[in-house]
Regions:
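Small-residue-enriched hydrophobic alpha-helices in membranes
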Residues: 1-146
Length: 146
């Protein structure tokens, strides 16, 4: 496995940790790659081929083994960024469920990320995805004069 595939495999495992691929999870994963070098430079065909390869790997190995193999192919800095991507993907649809928390804890161990660093990363996404109560003086349904 090359480092490009390995990095994507970590995110793919995060959105499919429970064996389900939701539309929102898949879209979030694709979005996470589409705005990151070198993935944003890939053609649609290359991106589809990568996603197909990841799906085949996931089916053949399972999420755990796929993550183990991916971790061997990434530098420490790449592992940190891959963990951050996984954390954001899992946090973006609401607070971490206990099973998601266990998955991320396990992922941190596999990637060699300390509990302190993992908590620091997760705290950022807790803030980033916090529920906000906002008010506005803007008219939500403006009346447009004829």
């Amino acid at each position: 496995m090359d480092s490009l595939t390995a990095f994507a495999a970590v995110g793919f495992a995060a959105v499919s940790w429970d064996g389900h691929f939701t539309k929102a999870g898949t879209r979030s994963f694709r979005h996470a790659l589409d705005y990151r070098e070198p993935f944003c430079q890939m053609t649609d065909g290359d991106m589809i081929a990568l996603l197909d390869d990841l799906l085949d790997l996931r089916r053949a190995l399972g999420a755990h083994e796929m993550m183990l193999q991916a971790a061997k192919c990434l530098t420490s800095a790449q592992c940190m960024t891959a963990y951050a991507m996984a954390s954001e993907l899992m946090r973006s649809d609401g607070p971490f469920e206990p099973e998601e928390r266990r998955f991320l804890d396990h992922l941190a161990v596999i990637l060699g990320i300390s509990k302190f660093e993992a908590q620091r990363i997760d705290a950022v996404f807790e803030i980033f995805h916090a529920r906000l109560t906002l008010s506005s003086t803007l008219e939500l349904n403006p009346v447009i004069p004829c």
